[in-house]
Amino acid sequence: MLGVLLYCFNTEYYRYDKIAAKTVPLLKKNLGLPITIVTNFDTFKCMPPLGFINYKIVDNEKGNNIDNKPWHNLDRHRAYELSPYDQTILLDIDYFCYTDHLLTLAETDQDFMVHDKVHDVSGNDSYKFARSSMVPMVWATCIIFKKTERTKAIFDMVRYIKERYNYFCELYRINFRNFRNDYAFAIALHQLGGFKGYETIPTRLPTLPGGAKVTKVTDTGVSWVWQGRVGSIENCDVHVIDKGVQNV
């Protein structure tokens, strides 16, 4: 069975349950797949009615920060054990799914795929990280995996890297010192693949950078303003970084 797995943990600054209220209906509409949300009890109590959802209540690991704010991203390595599906589309909760493109990507013989390139939909070409580490970064925003021994080893390796992240930052000269799943998965794939290449999602991850402030969300697209310029995207999946989208 193919299904979608999401993580949703509120913080004192951001209400991810409000973002889920916008993205989950889009997933249901455009993918028509069963959905599992991994969350904690405090966030679960805030969740709006979303129809049939399989909830996994966990005590999420804490201690990571970004921009001096809590960043609850330390449990993604548990996706293999927490997913009830034979094949899983693992997504960030702020992935706005406006197409059925992910269904096509899931029609693969590969047991693990992740984006290694990103497309800045604002047109500002914001993502240039080639000099930020010695290992090419991947984007853990969207991962498609099957339950195999190989994929289990990948997620186990991510856990191992998380527990020793400072060491791996030194080893791979990673500038971003707060734990980041993008680098953890990149290192895991690099090492478990015998330092060779690995299969990736053959498209760029459409992303709206955090500098773009979302002004409107509809059933078909997102609008924003950035540096005095207005932009929008229609009928295309997009990963929205601006957490202010919770209030739009």
Report residues per predicted region.
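Glycosyltransferase catalytic domains, chiefly GT-A lineage
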Residues: 1-248
